[in-house]
């Protein structure tokens, strides 16, 4: 799942610093994980990865053109008081990722 998240970060145009924050990892640990030295992924890390993959899945359902979904992540959004989904997720808490996922699930009729 971590490799899928790395690919997702590339598609979204997320920096390593941002990716580490989304995963709640320090920069050194993130860099080590990128080389394949994952170590143990805790419950919070698994939940973060699951939410990120869920966000990606919802965007693929909502947008026929994947590129539009990738752009949506960084676009201002009224649902988030004019902030982008990425800005919300970079709040750093697991609940920030969950907020974006719940919004997308509701938009696609998933819940």
Each model region followed by its residue ranges:
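Non-transmembrane "mature" sequence context
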Residues: 1-111
């Amino acid at each position: 799942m971590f490799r899928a998240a790395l690919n997702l970060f590339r598609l979204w145009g997320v920096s390593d610093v941002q990716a580490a924050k989304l995963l709640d990892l320090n920069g050194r640990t993130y860099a080590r994980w990128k080389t394949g030295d994952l170590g143990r992924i805790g419950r919070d890390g698994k939940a973060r990865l699951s939410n990120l993959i869920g966000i990606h899945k919802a965007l693929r359902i909502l947008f026929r053109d994947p590129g539009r979904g990738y752009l949506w992540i960084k676009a201002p959004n009224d649902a988030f008081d004019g902030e982008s989904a990425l800005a919300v997720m970079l709040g750093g808490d697991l609940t920030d990722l969950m907020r974006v996922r719940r919004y997308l699930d509701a938009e696609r009729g998933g819940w």
